[in-house]
From Swiss-Prot:
Keywords: Acetylation, Cytoplasm, Isopeptide bond, Nucleus, Phosphoprotein, Ribonucleoprotein, Ribosomal protein, Ubl conjugation. This is Small ribosomal subunit protein eS24. InterPro entries: eRP_eS24_sf (IPR053709), Ribosomal_eS24 (IPR001976), Ribosomal_eS24_CS (IPR018098), Ribosomal_uL23/eL15/eS24_sf (IPR012678). Component of the small ribosomal subunit. Part of the small subunit (SSU) processome, composed of more than 70 proteins and the RNA chaperone small nucleolar RNA (snoRNA) U3. The keyword Ribosomal protein applies. It comes from Macaca fascicularis.
């Protein structure tokens, strides 16, 4: 981690309802490429005396001309609250969520089975065959 990178937080808010702290993050990195999110998470963890696994940063945009990037960050009180409140795609980026993948053939067969029935019966057919 380089010392020429400065991280500032503003619009800091403690959201007690969702057990998290949320803020706008400003990263100053003059003459350097955009700082990786992992590095930002580590620096925020030091600033707020917590672990990087409960910190979620996203939505970073580098300003024209470079040197300044702004984004959004959330620090959860625990990992359980994060798993409960964060969207699945953000959890997947941290390796906390794995989407079960059905094969293409299974998806097509299910779709074609559902085409044969109408109304509320679709839910029964979509759930799978009864044995």
């Amino acid at each position: 981690m380089n010392d020429t990178v400065t991280i500032r937080t503003r619009k800091f808010m403690t959201n007690r309802l969702l057990q998290r702290k949320q803020m706008v993050i400003g990263v100053l990195h003059p003459g350097k490429a955009t700082v990786p999110k992992t590095e930002i998470r580590e620096k925020l963890a030091k600033m707020y005396k917590t672990t990087p696994d409960v910190i979620f940063v996203f939505g970073f945009r580098t300003h024209f001309g470079g040197g300044k990037t702004t984004g959004f960050g959330m620090i959860y009180d625990s990992l359980d609250y994060a798993k409960k409140n964060e969207p699945k795609h953000r959890l997947a980026r941290h390796g906390l969520y794995e989407k079960k993948k059905t094969s293409r053939k299974q998806r097509k067969e299910r779709k074609n089975r559902m085409k044969k029935v109408r109304g509320t019966a679709k839910a029964n057919v979509g759930a799978g065959k009864k044995k």
